[in-house]
Amino acid sequence: MERSQKEVLIGSVRQKFERMSSAVFLDFKGMNVEAVTKLRDEFRKSGVEYRVVKNTLVRHAIKEHPWAKTLSKSLTGMTGVAWSYEDPSAAAKVVKAFRKDNQKLQIKAGLIEGQILSGDAVETQLATMPGKDELRATLLATLQAPLQQFVQQLNAPLQNFAYLLKAKEEEAGKQA
């Protein structure tokens, strides 16, 4: 590969690291083509970009970041990088689900907001984080709860009055 091509590739990888919300570094040694293709499909469905990149190109692309030295220790052997742009936990969730059926896929490290995570931390912490949609639903439920309680309090006297009338009606029916 010519030097100019390498520079373009390094620039492309650098741009991915600048845009990402998180990244997961994987070792796919021992996996067959079918399994790797299935993994790529799962990443694509989740909006995660996955690419196999030479370790030296990644090192050059991240060298200006303060966490580069720490991450470089994990960049050995074959490395696949999964970048999440929207949902920080998307790549980790795909990897965790995929590893249930394929233990050959190994997590080397993770990266989120400048923090390097171990492979175990990616699987136990990052993969269990709620996604954007889950957080939105939780926020919406939290915002709606006081309003729903207020409406219930407003309706309570009417309900109680209706129960009272029904009880009086049943009592009158028993006396007759």
From Swiss-Prot:
Protein role: Forms part of the ribosomal stalk, playing a central role in the interaction of the ribosome with GTP-bound translation factors.
A Pfam family recorded for this sequence: Ribosomal_L10
Gene Ontology CC terms: large ribosomal subunit
InterPro entries xref list: Ribosomal_uL10, Ribosomal_uL10-like_sf, Ribosomal_uL10_bac, Ribosomal_uL10_bac_type, Ribosomal_uL10_CS_bac
Official protein name in the record: Large ribosomal subunit protein uL10
CDD domains: Ribosomal_L10
GO MF entry, a single one: large ribosomal subunit rRNA binding
Keywords, ordered alphabetically: Ribonucleoprotein, Ribosomal protein, RNA-binding, rRNA-binding
